[in-house]
Swiss-Prot record:
Chain segments carrying region Disordered: 168-208
Sequence ranges assigned to domain RRM in this UniProt record: 46-124
Gene Ontology terms, MF aspect: RNA cap binding
PROSITE patterns to which the protein is assigned, alphabetical: RRM
Full protein name: Nuclear cap-binding protein subunit 2
Localization, UniProt: Nucleus; Cytoplasm, Perinuclear region
Acidic residues biased stretches: 198-208
A GO CC term assigned to this protein in UniProt: perinuclear region of cytoplasm
PANTHER family xref list: 20 KD NUCLEAR CAP BINDING PROTEIN (PTHR18847), NUCLEAR CAP-BINDING PROTEIN SUBUNIT 2 (PTHR18847:SF0)
Residues where mRNA binds: 24, 49, 118-122, 129-133, 139-140
More details: In contrast to metazoans, where the CBC complex is involved in the nuclear export of capped U snRNAs, it is believed that in yeast, U snRNAs are not exported from the nucleus and U snRNPs are assembled in the nucleus from RNAs and imported proteins. Present with 6200 molecules/cell in log phase SD medium.
Keywords, in A-Z order: Cytoplasm, mRNA processing, mRNA splicing, mRNA transport, Nonsense-mediated mRNA decay, Nucleus, RNA-binding, Transport
GO biological process assignments: mRNA 3'-end processing; mRNA cis splicing, via spliceosome; mRNA export from nucleus; mRNA splicing, via spliceosome; mRNA transcription by RNA polymerase II; nuclear-transcribed mRNA catabolic process; nuclear-transcribed mRNA catabolic process, nonsense-mediated decay; primary miRNA processing
Length: 208
């Protein structure tokens, strides 16, 4: 599929256009037979995708920040498809495309709840896209994460399950090279976790 019309042309002493697809959208378009049309739609869309949110960030906090860029018609919180709890992303629908571009211009890489959020133009929300697509019900990016992040559920899937290695290989009889790679599940760490000894309370968000 040719995406020549979306190739970025760089000029000296110029600023980057906002109504251009991100590298993620370009990769997605190349795998999708209808990708070119979706790219064109996203460039004139009133919808944005917001990623890397804390699981504890509420819809009210998102509205307070993003309403500074225009009139918000709807916010769709991303949910774990099994637990129906927030899983770190959302869609925001503005009343016109210019307001979506305002959000992209002024709020990209902003910190919300101590997380640097990402913003991307979106072709438009469809029912079903609010659910995580990962094996555990959340986002795929969290399942590929190896570090502990309290704002995004702590550890994701145990290391052994992610790489497909039987748990028996991580017992006391395993070789040193194997045990060095083991990442314990959250319940194996006890109640004290360095840097996270004060647990944040779960919010009372109820998906509408």
């Amino acid at each position: 599929m040719s995406l020549e019309e979306f190739d970025e042309v760089k000029y000296d002493h110029s600023t980057k256009r906002l109504d251009t697809p991100s590298r993620y959208l370009l990769r997605k378009a190349r795998r999708n037979p209808n990708g070119l049309q979706e790219l064109r739609e996203s460039m004139k869309s009133s919808t944005i995708y917001v990623g890397n949110l804390s699981f504890y960030t509420s819809e009210e906090q998102i509205y307070e920040l993003f309403s500074k860029c225009g009139t918000i018609k709807r916010i769709i919180m991303g949910l774990d498809r099994f637990k129906f709890t927030p899983c770190g992303f959302c869609f925001i629908i503005y009343s016109c495309p210019d307001e979506a571009l305002n959000a992209l211009k002024y709020l990209s890489d902003t910190k919300l709840d101590e997380k640097t959020i990402t913003i991307d133009l979106d072709p438009g929300f469809e029912d079903g896209r609010q659910f995580g697509r990962g094996k555990s019900g959340g986002q795929v990016s969290d399942e590929l994460r190896f570090d502990f992040d309290a704002s995004r559920g702590g550890f994701a899937i145990p290391f052994a399950e992610r790489v497909g290695v039987p748990h028996s290989r991580f017992d006391n009889s395993s070789s040193q090279s194997n045990t060095n790679n083991y990442i314990p599940p959250p319940d194996a760490m006890g109640t004290f976790r360095p840097g996270f000894d004060e647990e944040r309370e779960d919010d009372n968000y109820v998906p509408q």
